[in-house]
């Protein structure tokens, strides 16, 4: 199962962590894992390349694991606001995946 955690502070998503594998299909053919991987990579790339936050962004990624902590990234209020567009888009997409494939994806949101 893929477990996704979002932390919110003052109505903003400041942290996300994605762990695990869906095991919905064979390696390389798992549409659930592919969907989650694609949208999370797109979001990280958007934060780093489109918003030019690559030098500030606190993140880590490896096989079956992505974490991004905006709260520890020393971003300006403007950078955090802009990042929310990408992160909220990812969140909406992942919620749709969870609705369709809830056996393989679990999302938790917590206010801090």
Which residues does each PLM region occupy?
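N-terminal intrinsically disordered, cationic/polar leader segments
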Residues: 1-31, 41, 45-112
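Short, conserved glycine- and acidic-residue-centered signature motifs
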Residues: 32-36
């Amino acid at each position: 199962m893929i477990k996704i955690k979002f932390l919110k502070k003052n109505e903003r998503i400041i942290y996300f962590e994605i762990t695990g594998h869906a095991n919905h299909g064979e390696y390389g053919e798992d549409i659930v894992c592919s969907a989650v991987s694609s949208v999370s990579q797109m979001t990280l790339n958007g934060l780093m390349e489109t918003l030019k936050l690559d030098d500030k962004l606190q993140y880590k990624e490896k096989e079956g694991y992505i974490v991004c902590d905006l709260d520890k990234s020393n971003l300006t209020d403007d950078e955090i606001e802009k990042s929310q567009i990408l992160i909220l888009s990812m969140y909406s997409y992942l919620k749709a995946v969870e609705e369709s494939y809830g056996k393989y994806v679990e999302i938790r949101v917590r206010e801090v």
